[in-house]
């Protein structure tokens, strides 16, 4: 991952928020939604949510603008074990402005690297974001 491909930097406050989120002790579903501040050329925090299901989360995402999401999900495995994977979701809806798409796509890898996440997914429509979709994606990481 070459730093020369970075389009936008990550806001230092967001870096700290991501660090705290990564080590949170709560056992509920939670999310951080991030956006690109075009004027500052920076990825910034847009909103935080506690006790939010995938279906509720998708209602918080714009249908025509990209967003980055870090989602802490209470995942109950088939054998009864419970884990709390941190998922990075890049919402990149069809029909976004090409300039926006490039800013987000060019900033994604750096943000994933800073957040230290390995479960990285992309959705092309907010309708894709639901519990079934998320469980299918997470099943790959067993």
Curated annotation (Swiss-Prot):
Q: Which Pfam families match?
A: Cofilin_ADF
SUPFAM superfamilies in the record: Actin depolymerizing proteins
> Cross-referenced SMART domains, in alphabetical order?
ADF
Q: Name one GO molecular function term.
A: Arp2/3 complex binding
| Signal sequence, renumbered to the chain | none
Please describe the organ and tissue distribution of this protein's expression.
Expressed in rat thymus, testis, and spleen. Is present predominantly in proliferative and differentiative organs.
Q: Which cellular component appears as one GO term in the record?
A: cortical actin cytoskeleton
Q: Which residues form the ADF-H domain?
A: 4-139
**What Gene Ontology terms for biological process does this UniProt record contain?**
actin filament debranching; negative regulation of Arp2/3 complex-mediated actin nucleation
Residues found modified as N-acetylserine: 2
Q: Which InterPro entries does the UniProt entry name for this protein?
A: ADF-H (IPR002108), ADF-H/Gelsolin-like_dom_sf (IPR029006), GMF (IPR011171)
Q: Does the keyword 4Fe-4S apply?
A: no
UniProt keyword Acetylation present: yes
Which key words are in the record? Acetylation, Growth factor
Which family, according to the similarity comment? Belongs to the actin-binding proteins ADF family. GMF subfamily.
Protein name (Swiss-Prot/TrEMBL): Glia maturation factor gamma
